[in-house]
Amino acid sequence: MAALSCLLDSVRRDIKKVDRELRQLRCIDELSARCLCDLYMHPYCCCDLHPYPYCLCYSKRSRSCGLCDLYPCCLCDVKLYCLRPSLRSLERKAIRAIEDEKRELAKLRRTTNRILASSCCSSNILGSVNVCGFEPDQVKVRVKDGKVCVSAERENRYDCLGSKKYSYMNICKEFSLPPCVDEKDVTYSYGLGSCVKIESPCYPCTSPCNPCNPCNPCSPCSPCNPCNPCSPCSPCSPCNPCDPCNPCYPCGSRFSCRKMIL
């Protein structure tokens, strides 16, 4: 019974929705069948907005245009003809709204790609390429000689008056890999916003060696015990070329060097 009641509720909602749409269609039909002269223009209006130089009410109805008694001149001259928005103005507003939404969407997509490209310090993303307008199977990624090349190509076909027209779209972006990233470890994925992300399992680093233990070609020895070419001997017992004799029996004492040699 609970399932049947839920089904009946959904059917009632669908019926109400269809009734609303039918009422809207009836209102649109009534407005389109009504004479536009009663609402928008003077019977002798010759402006660019109205295609007829005279009021059509004289040929359709016995009475004259309803605005003739109130306004002796054309309302288009004083910009008062828009008592209610016409279909043409509504179309212009809808087109402007669609264009604004497209610009906002493109701005958000560029911001997202910029954030993804600058987030290499907190993730393993090496780069990102925007491939908007291409399908995932049309995107190709090639890694060779320390470089990543992202390319995409598509063919558009249009049928126009019995003939066919073709147009081609392609994109190609290339960037170099960091020195610490191996070509075999590079992967790519097609994410949200038509963005191809190039990733690696290890974090990219700016220097080829570990920043905590860098390789210094100028000091090949350990920094705690460097090789000093200026003092090859120990500083505690230096070699003195001016005192070749035993420091305990120096020259000039009561024992001469000759006696010591003998």
From Swiss-Prot:
Residues with PTM Phosphoserine: S5, S10, S64, S86, S122, S123, S151, S167, S189, S194
GO biological process: cell differentiation; spermatogenesis
Compartments it resides in: Cell projection, Cilium, Flagellum; Cytoplasm, Cytoskeleton; Cytoplasm, Cytoskeleton, Microtubule organizing center, Centrosome
Tissue expression per record: Testis.
One Gene Ontology cellular component annotation held by this UniProt entry: centrosome
Annotated InterPro entries: A-crystallin/Hsp20_dom, HSP20-like_chaperone, ODF1_ACD, ODFP
Keyword NAD found: no
Recorded superkingdom: Eukaryota
Domain notes: The C-terminal contains many C-X-P repeats.
Protein name: Outer dense fiber protein 1
Natural source organism: Bos taurus
Gene designation per UniProt: ODF1
